[in-house]
Amino acid sequence: MLKYEFLHGLQKRSHYLRQLSGQFFSRSYSSKIRNIGILAHIDAGKTTTTERMLFYAGKTRTLGEVHRGNTVTDYLTQERERGITICSSAVTFAWNGHRINLLDTPGHIDFTMEVEQSLYAVDGVVVVLDGTAGVEAQTVTVWTQADKHKLPRLIFVNKMDRPDADFEKCIADLKEKLEAHPVCLQYPVKNEDGVLAINDVITLERLTWQQKDLGQKYIRMKLEPSDELRDLQEKRNELIDRLSGVDDELADVVISTESFDKVDNHLIERALRRATGQLKVVPVLLGSAYKNVGIQRLMDAVNSYLPAPEERNQIYDCFGSEVAGKVFKIVHDKQRGALTLVRILRGEIKKGMRLISARGQAEVVSKLYEPLADEYREVNAVQSGDVVICAGLKSTVTGDLLTSSQSTLKNAQKRLKQSLGTTESVIPELDDESEESEDMFGLDPQIPDAVYFCSIEPPSISSQTAMEQALRQLQREDPSLRVSYDSVTGQTVLGGMGELHMDIIKSRILSEYKIDVDLGPLQIAYKETIESPALTTLSVEKEIAGAKQNVSITLELVKDKSEIFSLDKSPENMPNLNTLRPRILQVLKKGAIGALERGPRVGGQVVDTQIRLHNATIGRGTADSFVMATAAQCVQKVLSTSGTRLLEPIMSLQIVAPSERISGIMADLSRRRAQINDVLPKGERNKMILVNAPLAELSGYSSALRTISSGTASMTMQPCGFSAMNSVDESQAERRAQGLE
């Protein structure tokens, strides 16, 4: 039996790599860079997997443990206290001649926006599955997000040391729940003591990790002739057969080879890389991050199978050698101020460089840093394909596209349009240039709707300004946090993705800004939609500071989900509309759309409604602010005529419980206006209920579920849209909004 020992992450070698990273790796060619995200359902072991990667790569000297609160990537106080990832964090490390920029993302549904922004910055992802649970609710969510970005991915089935882990079930889940095309590169085996080892399908080797040195060593053993070897050879043949069906190069080799046994391992790996990059297959690996098994081979797979930056994002070739960068995260450091994480798509960013956002904001990069969660190493320049932290950017927000100049952006847009075979703008005439830039380059952030809102008050009047500044900074970091001012109550109002999201915001304001704010009771973020189309005209004439202000506007509201603002192009109205300057149209549009943010019944956003401008007459010398205010008043007047209906947020739940508890749980759900979609078997003793229910009926539901099931049930929940309400429920919602219930 042949044995080979491999030692990864030795401190001497690690020290050398850290020195080298300041020379070679920060300037490494794009082909040697891997920008990856780590995605998972909460508690699948994602952060532990990341911490093991850092340890074996020599970036850390000790193993970070979630339960000990000493992790590198979960560095916020709230993350370490709760044992969950809240903010995406970026770390850079060297592994086998490659530079890996890794983003650890949240697994909780309240922080989906963090995941969404991070996926703009990566070229591939590792999806971590809990080997005892398979594909879970948030796994489906992050998988869908990865599909949207067309990201190649690897699967790491974690916790395979556990006695209740089921590898075959995980593979079945991938096929059934995600409609994925998994190819297994490894299979689990356990010795007489139940210690996990791995059989490698490509090399036909047994991999065993040594626990006495924290898994830094692992042994590769060629399997001797046996039933086990024959079974593994059959799996290797199946892998070759699968790959040859999707990869022509390997198919040609297979046709000219007398036996699958003669197909070289390197040919299989190259075919696997091509098929993974083309989203034809998803390689599956396994291990146990907590027990230090399988992590080095996972990092090898990242290098071998996930794409380099140069293999993706060809749309940005229109920038040539000029800078194009995507802002995917902003954090605030007590010493350094706002730090902006940028994925460099083209060109090179240097210290002291002047950059322009697609919104036209000019910025100067004061310093550049290499990321390691909340630690930083200063560098002078970073090239295309890499990830960098920029200090000194004052007005840039998460989701911005950065370039070297406005002319660079315009020239890139022109070249892109020419390459697409069109010289005309693909954006409607009313949209502005920044919106066109974001849309054309696929960077338009999809900010999810808030499902909860509450008032926020400072502890004293003197703290008001500091609180507002803290909220501005938090909004730059987190676009899903909504901050507005209620002119009726005079309160500042927060909108967020869930109870945990709002709780974390309050906690961060206290811990990071030393302001003990008071949050009002959580309110449901209802929406409104018009009951029927309506048309009205509003004419306003005033004298302000000696100047005559005169505006007359005719607007119509109609039911339409496709477009929020349009011009009525009927023959009787076009002569008037053609006389309006583009700037005036933009002012009218901004004022009218702004009025839809607060509906007449509960102050909810008015949706599925189109504003149709019929006619507008603007007196000479009338201020833009007066035109905007009149447009808003006209929309409010039409809303009072059309009337509105309430739409309530609906949540999708997956509840897993023992079979004998299901009837009691379903009886309780029926009292909460829930719609049961399905009840499925979940293992031998459990069942899973798939259900949709109004968010208003789910206050305190996790506690109620624990009581009903005597602590045996588990639940995941995520928003799944809005639904119309009946008149009784509408009246109750209005009373809640008015504080009468």
Curated annotation (Swiss-Prot):
Binding, GTP: 40-47, 104-108, 158-161
GO MF term set: GTP binding; GTPase activity
Entry annotated with the keyword S-adenosyl-L-methionine: no
Residues annotated as transmembrane: none
Pfam families listed in its UniProt record: EF-G_D2, EFG_C, EFG_III, GTP_EFTU
InterPro entries for this protein: EF-G-like_DII, EFG2, EFG_II, EFG_III, EFG_III/V, EFG_V, EFG_V-like, G_TR_CS
Domain of life: Eukaryota
Keyword Transit peptide: yes
Compartment(s) where it occurs, according to its Swiss-Prot or TrEMBL record: Mitochondrion
Transit peptide residue numbers: 1-29
UniProt record similarity statement: Belongs to the TRAFAC class translation factor GTPase superfamily. Classic translation factor GTPase family. EF-G/EF-2 subfamily.
Protein name stated in the entry: Ribosome-releasing factor 2, mitochondrial
